[in-house]
């Protein structure tokens, strides 16, 4: 009954003292209610877990979650589990009420942490303390992410929550457990096979630990904390997946530990700290006590990142010479259906491209501009998604692609949209257009390698199903 009509419980009293006031949220697990103590007015969050349709394994997992949460509930930065009540059709978990919701909302919508090093350090040290307490009693969270962290009555306090994937095993064979953005490399034993052109790229092999039969759960939590720290500082994720074989940005980081410093508004101090957190060898990865000390002593976490132009100064003179051709092309393209997107930056060049253009890999100088690309040639067009394989027009010449790939890799990708456009061909010209569209917490594409061709019309990669809708 509760699963089909959760509103029926509103106004009713649970356990002789808790009146259901409103619904906070709902999911496959059940419903979370806001409840009020009828005697003293104290507010609680009550998670109603459905019992109907659960098999024995699911019931054991449900019981394990509650038992593990209860063991660490007394910590000041972990959501308090007050008591558990059970009826014929549901289990009611009475929890500490946090009216401000989760950290994900505060990072992406309210934006109170970005640029505030003191506030970031305050809440991040609280998270370290909470996770360190869990580890001290032999509990490993395995699903650390902003969605599972609640914000207190003010933004200076946060609480760790949701122990649904927690374990007492220091080593686990549950590869892929957690949320993809926050998984360590060793937690991702299964990797996709490289495509033919990607195989030619210089890729550093994954560490031996990532190929073993199990992975250490404590260092895996440390890795996730590092991603959360970047979320707090920059309002985005550094990569989609910590796999050098399938993720370009992470591959760049493996080859050059200064990659994040060049594409994120972080300080050199924080970059050095992140290098310790993102040590691919879990045995030498920074420990939580070390992490707490270094964060406490870090003076500045962020820095002001000066925006760079999409078109480099070296190419600007050449572009000005082609101004008339660009204006003609611009007048023609205004008739296309852009679905609300307007070009903000562009690169124009003659078709077929000159050897000077092809040899210049600096047409686009920055990966920080939040745009997607439209590449036009006299024969065809495509929408470029820089974090996925570059889609080549059927009639494009091979000499065009090094420069086109460099341009595509130098801009920010919006993986959640796909914008097909069919323009009219323009003789003797080609052009790359940028379109603004920046979702929160999206990965930053790697710049440096030629992206390999893929079938025309490929859609954007699917987003991590564990993420909230943005």
UniProtKB/Swiss-Prot annotation:
It catalyses: L-seryl-[protein] + ATP = O-phospho-L-seryl-[protein] + ADP + H(+); L-threonyl-[protein] + ATP = O-phospho-L-threonyl-[protein] + ADP + H(+). This is Negative regulator of sexual conjugation and meiosis. GO terms for cellular component: cytoplasm; cytosol; nucleus. The keyword Nucleotide-binding applies. The active site is at 143 (proton acceptor). It holds the Pfam family Pkinase. GO terms for molecular function: ATP binding; protein kinase activity; protein serine kinase activity; protein serine/threonine kinase activity. ATP binds at residues 24-32, 47. Keywords: ATP-binding, Conjugation, Kinase, Meiosis, Nucleotide-binding, Phosphoprotein, Serine/threonine-protein kinase, Transferase. Belongs to the protein kinase superfamily. Ser/Thr protein kinase family. The gene is ran1. It comes from Schizosaccharomyces pombe (strain 972 / ATCC 24843) (Fission yeast). GO terms for biological process: cell cycle G1/S phase transition; G2/M transition of mitotic cell cycle; meiotic cell cycle; negative regulation of cell cycle switching, mitotic to meiotic cell cycle; negative regulation of induction of conjugation with cellular fusion; negative regulation of protein import into nucleus; negative regulation of transcription by RNA polymerase II; positive regulation of G1/S transition of mitotic cell cycle. The lineage of its organism: Eukaryota, Fungi, Dikarya, Ascomycota, Taphrinomycotina. This protein is a negative regulator of both sexual conjugation and meiosis. It phosphorylates mei2. It blocks the onset of meiosis until conjugation takes place. The modification Phosphoserine is found at residue 469. The keyword Nucleotide-binding applies. Residues 18-295 form the Protein kinase domain.
